[in-house]
Each structure stands twice: as structure tokens, then as C-alpha cells.
Amino acid sequence: GKSIIETVRLIMETGTCPKYEEIKKKKDPRKEFIEIYGVGPSKAKELMDMGIKSVQELKSFDEEKIESVLNEKQRIGLQYYDDILARIPHSEIKRHERYLKSVLKKIDPNSELTIAGSYRRKNKTSGDIDILIKANKKQIFQDFVQKLKDDGYMYEELALGDKKFMGLANMAKGKEVAKPTPCRRVDIMITTEKEYPFAILYF
């Protein structure tokens, strides 16, 4: 009809369509909720069914209401939502790498640490920091994670197993700093020398 012809003419003249641009700007609440760490499709639907329209609206709730809606890990995900979504510059990960290697060397000089993923592939930015430790004792992994916590480098624990740790780290190393840098998603995995070549490909 006439409106379609007008829309086509507008696109040809300006290269864009205001209505389309407006639609693009509107965020899909479900997609936005799923970006919160620990929130899956069913939880996202539950939040939408409650009438919550955005992450920003969810953040505006008081502490008691947030606790009634989200579990502990999801609350951490909401608190650090912007930090977790932010890309990490290659140069910043280099700083993490220097610190992490110095910590591991003090615990066990024979163990090795590699930052894998997009950092190892020389990408300009990364979504998180994937740390692979090559060591012959699980205790080294446990001591390493504990030292990161003691230093104040590891802000939040998201998951901890025998061979893998997931958390949020900050190069400011301590919550007492006036302006801490963004918290970064960090995954740490321990592997034996035999498993290492396969682990580096996976991680």
C-alpha cells in the first residue's frame, strides 16, 4: 500500500528508516535477562511474567525484593551486570597475566600458567579471562585460588570444583580502593602435563 511505498522511498533517499531504527533500539527483555549471570530462559520468562521490563528496572528494586526474585549467584550477576558484559582489552589481561604468574611461581615454581581463549589467539579484546594451570598436584590449584582470594584479587566466587574455579576478579586487588577497575569474569582450570595439549584447545 501507500505506507510501504513511502517507506521504500524514504530508505532510498536517506538510507534508513526511522521506524526500523526505533525497533532496533528496543531491547528484547528476555535476551537482556539471559545476559545476567545464572539466569536462563525459564528464569527470564518468570521475570517477564512478573511484569519486569528491563535489567535497569530489576536493579532499582530494594535488596529484600531482589532476594525474593533471584538466587545468590544471580544477584551477583545482576550486581556486576555491566562489568561482566564489558569487553576486556588485551593490554589489561597482560597485567592480570603478570600478577597471576607471580602468584603461581611463589606457590610452585615448577607449575605453568597460560591464559587461553581469545587472549592466546591475540584478539584485541576478550569476554573473560581463561586461565589454565599445568600442575601435578590438585593442592597447588587450591592454594592458588585461596591466595587470589587472600590478596583481594578475587572479588566473588561463582563456582568451585576439584579442577575448576569461576569467579569475578579485579586488578585493583582490594575493595578499599577509591576507584576499582571493572570486575572481570575469570575461569581457572588445572590440568596435568598429559592433558594440557587437549585442554588448551578446549579452553
Enumerate the language-model features and the residues they cover.
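Conserved catalytic core of two-metal-ion nucleotidyltransferases
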Residues: D150-E195
